[in-house]
Amino acid sequence: FLPFLASLLSKVL
């Protein structure tokens, strides 16, 4: 899982 994707998920969730 890519770090930038994790950041986006954190913002969405």
UniProtKB/Swiss-Prot annotation:
Its main location: secreted. One of its GO terms (biological process) is defense response to bacterium. The keyword Secreted applies. Keywords: Amidation, Amphibian defense peptide, Antibiotic, Antimicrobial, Secreted. Belongs to the frog skin active peptide (FSAP) family. Temporin subfamily. Antibacterial activity against Gram-positive bacterium S.aureus (MIC=80 uM). This is Temporin-1Cd. The lineage of its organism: Eukaryota, Metazoa, Chordata, Craniata, Vertebrata.
